[in-house]
Every structure is written in structure tokens, then in C-alpha cells.
From Swiss-Prot:
Protein name: ATP-dependent Clp protease adapter protein ClpS
Gene: clpS
Coiled coil residues, start to end: none
Entries under SUPFAM superfamilies matching the protein: ClpS-like (SSF54736)
Organism phylogeny: Bacteria, Pseudomonadati, Pseudomonadota, Betaproteobacteria, Burkholderiales
Subunit structure: Binds to the N-terminal domain of the chaperone ClpA.
Pfam families xref list: ClpS (PF02617)
Cysteine pairs bridged by disulfides in the record: none
Family to which the UniProt record says this protein belongs: Belongs to the ClpS family.
GO-annotated biological processes: protein catabolic process; proteolysis
Chain's role: Involved in the modulation of the specificity of the ClpAP-mediated ATP-dependent protein degradation.
InterPro entries: ClpS, ClpS_core, Ribosomal_bL12_C/ClpS-like
Length: 104
């Protein structure tokens, strides 16, 4: 707490410490389906989540084997944007790939 003198009327103001919480974080998750090609999933992970080919392939295999895979953890706005971008790109390419966000 800092004490700040007020020069106009000789009162002393106390500055309250602000308590800021870190923003809520959200996982961006790809969901498996039987129609989207594995290579397309790898390309999506590389393009929208800035992963190298090896990491993107590992995420794709996790999606394929376990039904879901986390691509990254972001603030709400960024996660929402990434979900929208991935789903839009998949639909434009004719694939039913699903992408969702979940609280981390």
C-alpha cells in the first residue's frame, strides 16, 4: 500500500493494491471422426497451432487412438478464434472435423 499526499487540501490518500487474477485458460481439443484424413489433421495442427510436423503427428495419433487430442491452451478469446478457424477450414475442405474448447 502506498501513501500519496494530496497537495491541494493536505489529505493523505491510500492506494489500494489491485488484486488481479490470471485470465481463465481454455484447452482447444480436436475430436476424432471416421472421415477426416489423418494428413489433413496434421496440416491443421501445424497451421493453426504452430506445431512442428512431429508434434502435429503425435497430436493426430492421440485424436485417432483416444478420440480427442489437446492442441493447445489459450485465453478464452484466442481459444474461441482457433476453434472457429479450424472448423471453418475443415468445412471449406469438405471434412467433418470437430474442434471444441474446454476450461483448462
Amino acid at each position: 500500500m502506498a501513501i500519496i499526499p494530496d497537495k491541494q487540501d493536505n489529505t493523505v490518500l491510500e492506494r489500494q493494491e489491485q488484486k488481479l487474477k490470471p485470465p481463465a485458460m481454455f484447452k482447444v481439443v480436436l475430436l476424432n471422426d471416421d472421415f477426416t484424413p489423418m494428413e489433413f489433421v496434421v496440416m491443421i495442427v501445424q497451421e493453426y497451432f504452430n506445431k512442428d510436423r512431429e508434434t502435429a503427428t503425435q497430436i493426430m495419433l492421440k485424436v485417432h487412438r483416444e478420440g480427442r487430442g489437446v492442441c493447445g491452451v489459450y485465453t478464452r478469446d484466442i481459444a474461441s478464434t482457433k476453434v472457429e478457424q479450424v472448423v471453418t477450414h475443415a468445412r471449406q475442405a469438405g471434412h467433418p472435423l470437430q474442434c471444441v474448447m474446454e476450461e483448462a
